[in-house]
Amino acid sequence: KGEFIKKISRRAKYILIKFNNGTLVMHLGMSGSVSVVPSIEALKKHHHFELVLDNATSMRFHDPRRFGSILWQNNNEQLNLFKNLGPEPLSSEFDDEILYLSSRGRKKNIKTFIMDSNIVVGVGNIYASESLFQAGISPKRAAGKTSKKRYQALTQCIKIILSEAIKNGGTTLNDFSNIDGKPGYFSQVLSVYGRN
């Protein structure tokens, strides 16, 4: 009570809500969602957290599968959650050089490699499949045996695919919805994900 929201941001799959005394750290898990609704609206099943705002609205965390989490970080605390995370894929810190150098000596396949959040965050199964297809790279190819030229193409494709997904409101396959409760439409333009 009496706290002010100073900033809302994101790091990897974490939503960060900065207050005067600390930061609320939310992870949506597999099927969690956040919505902003009138405070008088009744709580629904699987609403596990409510932040009541002073404008008669509430931010609610809905998590039917209970894979999500909510943590509080005091201003003077460092959370280990972010320590080993790779760069954001749409940031200038993410480039083909980082991917190429990180891949040297790795035997795992390239799809698993780019889905590793220690390498780059935010490239999940759908976006890895689509990016590799667009770059013309087999997902089974060994990460350590992939050329720098292929990593240049892959990096560009990751950035394009993720930008397109954001522009289309995300990818709704089962139960994903954005903060307004609307589905994402990127699933309508998927080239390979979910196909045999």
Residue ranges, per PLM feature:
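Basic, nucleic-acid-binding surfaces and adjacent catalytic neighborhoods in DNA/RNA-processing proteins
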Residues: 9, 102-196
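Short, solvent-exposed polar/charged micro-motifs at secondary-structure junctions
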Residues: 16-18, 71
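Short, surface-exposed charged micro-motifs
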Residues: 7, 16, 50
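Generic beta-strand structural signal
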Residues: 10, 18-19, 53
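A glycine-biased structural micro-motif
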Residues: 1-6
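Phosphate/anion-contacting hairpin/loop surfaces
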Residues: 24-122, 127-134
